[in-house]
């Protein structure tokens, strides 16, 4: 299928954009009509008659370690210039020229079409020129992605630090709420929205997968030192060793979010991550890693056990941060692993409890406690530590609203499970043990 969109434009100016003295393009408006949104943002496989590109944008600035919204609005292609380029000209003139170059900005785009290969190239050059920007691009539909040049430049976007993803229900709802003259009405998903999202998402994953393979020339790219994980936009390879790509901030906030998810569709976005830090008693630097279970394959906990077994370690302390508590099978395998290694100290923190009301899952948690594994719920100190070690040590963690309240509720729920199985005293005994290397 060949999408319908304006053809390539000629005569783009030099970079930095805006220094070319082109006329400044302005947003068409802050809000678009419901009819325009439903027609142009519908994530169809074949989008007949949709030649225009709409770009809804939000610009935030970091102020005293907190994000502050500066601008939001809507661009549309104009004078044969695509919406993305119109935005970049506008952003240069209205933001970069006005505010200090030391300011840090986050830009979020919600687009009816993903960038064409020429726009993607221009965006890459713009990001390379301005290192104080971060850019997230969510697209309703993929434009001409069968073209090798388009695929290559989408990859270059990711390699330059942009986040590129397909719009899911969460993004459609957010876009509807902020950029549509909705008259107070809630967003009503159209038929096959989620099905079409999964198709667009899988195509994008396939295109971007090579972007995330990063093996240093001095490292061996064997299966033993490559861990598979996913992120936004999904699949990524991380290399264990001195240099490890961190989780993106967007990934962390969406995947470790500890509050109750009201809509079933959002559960498809909640992935089972396992971040671990291994500290040895011989003074060596801690080892870190992040794992994610693939659908239909081994869970992250099993990948973690295989990794630790291959190291043949004895006296170590391991801290794990999980987005979901282990399933019964993973719990029993973790428990068996711990019983075979009494000198190993394993502490598991989980953001959310997985099927905690079902007896087999409760029994799995009990097997962890009975084996001597410490299982607890992530609270603000753990979220902060996870952020520092696996996301961005240079930026402070900004807690979401209600984080500590929800953590305490989840802790009470976990405590009730312990009490219902008569394990509270046992867990308290483990908590009072002196954990550490033998005293000389």
UniProtKB/Swiss-Prot annotation:
Catalyses which reaction(s): a 2'-deoxycytidine in single-stranded DNA + H2O + H(+) = a 2'-deoxyuridine in single-stranded DNA + NH4(+)
GO biological process: defense response to virus; hematopoietic progenitor cell differentiation; innate immune response; negative regulation of viral genome replication; regulation of defense response to virus; regulation of viral life cycle; transposable element silencing
CC per GO annotation: cytoplasm
Domain of life, source organism: Eukaryota
Keywords: Antiviral defense, Cytoplasm, Hydrolase, Immunity, Innate immunity, Metal-binding, Repeat, Zinc
Entry cofactors: Zn(2+)
Domain notes: The CMP/dCMP deaminase domain 1 confers deoxycytidine deaminase activity, whereas the CMP/dCMP deaminase domain 2 mediates RNA-dependent oligomerization and virion incorporation.
Protein name: DNA dC->dU-editing enzyme APOBEC-3
Organism listed in the record: Mus musculus
């Amino acid at each position: 299928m060949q999408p319908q969109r304006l053809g390539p434009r000629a005569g783009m100016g030099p970079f930095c954009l805006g220094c070319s003295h082109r006329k400044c393009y302005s947003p068409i408006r802050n809000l678009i009509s419901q009819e325009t949104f439903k027609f142009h943002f519908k994530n169809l496989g074949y989008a007949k008659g949709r030649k225009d590109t709409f770009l809804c944008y939000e610009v935030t600035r970091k102020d005293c370690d907190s994000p502050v919204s500066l601008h939001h609005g809507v661009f549309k292609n104009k004078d044969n210039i695509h919406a993305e380029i119109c935005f970049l000209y506008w952003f240069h003139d209205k933001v970069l020229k006005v505010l200090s170059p030391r300011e840090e900005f986050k830009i979020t785009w919600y687009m009816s079409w993903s960038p064409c290969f020429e726009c993607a190239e221009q965006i890459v050059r713009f990001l390379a020129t301005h290192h104080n920007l971060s850019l997230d691009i969510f697209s309703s539909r993929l434009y001409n992605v069968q073209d090798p040049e388009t695929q290559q430049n989408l990859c270059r976007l990711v390699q330059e630090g942009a986040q590129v993803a397909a719009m899911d229900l969460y993004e459609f709802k957010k876009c509807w709420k902020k950029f549509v003259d909705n008259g107070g009405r809630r967003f009503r998903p159209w038929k096959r929205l989620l099905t079409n999202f999964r198709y667009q998402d899988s195509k994008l994953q396939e295109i971007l997968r090579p972007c995330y393979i990063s093996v240093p020339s001095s490292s061996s790219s064997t299966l033993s030192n490559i861990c598979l994980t996913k992120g936004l936009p999904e699949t990524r390879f991380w290399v264990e060793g001195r240099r490890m790509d961190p989780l993106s901030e967007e990934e962390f906030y969406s995947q470790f979010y500890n509050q109750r998810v009201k809509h079933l569709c959002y559960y498809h976005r909640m992935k089972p991550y396992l971040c671990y830090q291994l500290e040895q008693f011989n003074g060596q630097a801690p080892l870190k890693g992040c794992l994610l279970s693939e659908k239909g394959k081994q869970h992250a906990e099993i990948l973690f056990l295989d990794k630790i077994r291959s190291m043949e370690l004895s006296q170590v302390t391991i801290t794990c941060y999980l987005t979901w508590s282990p399933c019964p099978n993973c719990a029993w395998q973790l428990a068996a692993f711990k019983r075979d290694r009494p000198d190993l100290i394993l502490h598991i923190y989980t953001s959310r409890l997985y099927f905690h009301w079902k007896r087999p899952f409760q029994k799995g948690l009990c097997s962890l406690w009975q084996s001597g594994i410490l299982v607890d719920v992530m609270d603000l100190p753990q979220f902060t530590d996870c952020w520092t070690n696996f996301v961005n040590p240079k930026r402070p963690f900004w807690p979401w609203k209600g984080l500590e309240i929800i953590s305490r509720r989840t802790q009470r729920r976990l405590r009730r499970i312990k009490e219902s199985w008569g394990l509270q005293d046992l867990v308290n005994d483990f908590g009072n043990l002196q954990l550490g290397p033998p005293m000389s």
